[in-house]
Swiss-Prot record:
The lineage of its organism: Bacteria, Bacillati, Bacillota, Bacilli, Bacillales. InterPro entries: YkyB (IPR025552). It comes from Bacillus subtilis (strain 168). Pfam families: YkyB. This is Uncharacterized protein YkyB.
């Protein structure tokens, strides 16, 4: 199958990339293994900011802080969409802190399948998803062994 079949009609424009990041981010929140999706989002946002297609706005207090500690996230604007990602040390030095997250603003809905979004971002970032290899095979079921009363199990 052609690798470009999914993204033939999708060019890596700011609008398409922001919709793809939105779609990947939305699916990552409920995915059984979200690490790859969040990594793809992070790399795409970093590249968009580096190329000047996105802008770091400031810092927000995180809605879900780790270990119950107060934590901040960087607010990034790309097209009509806003995203959060973990900050770097430089972000704390150079970006203003915006306080708590404004709940009144919502990103516009994007109609893009996860497959198309992933392929567009993978092409843009230059990343490939490694197939998920199960860590361990489940052992075959063994019937329990019952010993006679008084016999040792060892």
């Amino acid at each position: 199958m052609d690798d470009h079949a999914y993204t033939k009609d999708l060019q890596p424009t700011v609008e398409n990339l922001s919709k793809a990041v939105y779609t990947v981010n939305r699916h990552a929140k409920t995915a059984p293994n979200p690490k790859y999706l969040y990594l793809l989002k992070k790399r795409a946002l970093q590249k968009l900011v580096k190329e000047g297609k996105g802008k770091k706005i400031g810092l927000h207090f995180s809605k879900n802080p780790r270990f119950s500690q107060q934590q901040s996230d960087v607010l990034i604007s790309i097209g009509d969409y806003y995203f959060h990602m973990p900050p770097t040390k430089e972000d704390f030095e150079h970006l203003p802190h915006l306080g708590t997250l404004n709940q009144s603003y919502r990103n516009p809905k994007a109609q893009m399948s996860l497959t198309k979004a992933k392929h567009l971002l993978q092409e843009y970032v230059g990343m490939k998803e490694k197939p998920l290899v199960p860590n361990r095979q489940q052992p075959a079921y063994h019937k329990p062994v019952f010993k006679k009363l008084g016999e040792s199990y060892f």
